[in-house]
């Protein structure tokens, strides 16, 4: 069984990996419901930890524990080995609002839509995203992120979940005007720093990833509210299909798509402005905040 919640954090200027101490706390920073972190004594590199999980002997917390209030949480993975794999239009309600925005006819997808997002680094919880001068239509997308734990190739649907390491929250920040300009998603979804990730990685057997409430807020106003039960294509389907096309390496990040309620879905659209704070929340994982600056 893979259980627990892992974090990457900065304490007195030094990076550590740790496991959250399940002490029954409610709420708290980052919505984690925990006050203490037990450092891991193996490595401070989460990608190395994932890839070599069995060789490193799994989770081995050490003493002394530190308070969550004394540290700065970092993105649980500093940077991906390869660009993350993303799913587009994987909630029916979001597929409909996206097609309305583009003036296309509503329809349900028969097959998953896959794309990649250029990511040199994952942005930390409570980080600032600078939207720059290239977009006036910056949008938010709360997403369940799946992290692969072992290399997999030609994996069946029934075996697929055995290859999952854990889950996190991603915000797929997207420049809609750049997407429309280039008539595809890659550039508009790849602005520097446009993939905040965190606040932790919840190990696979700690929750039911297909029955989680998923929400986003802008300045405290609820914008997105759905459940991962509404995914059109579930996690085993995605892993099984992709592993047939190519090897999914340990540490691969897969972002499962977003529900309706994004800025472009409103009439008129409600895109992000300088000073806005986006809060992405998934039940059992936590809260991921990002502030928008110029």
Language model segments and positions:
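Short catalytic-site patches enriched in acidic/histidine residues
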Residues: 113-131, 153, 193-200, 259-264
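Catalytic-pocket segment enriched in acidic/His residues
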Residues: 66, 72, 94, 174-294
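A generic local secondary-structure boundary/capping motif
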Residues: 74-76, 102-105, 129-138, 152-159, ...
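Structural signature of FAD isoalloxazine-binding scaffolds in flavoprotein oxidoreductases
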Residues: 103-124, 140, 273-284
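N-terminal non-catalytic cap/leader segment that marks the start of a structured domain
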Residues: 1-108, 277-279
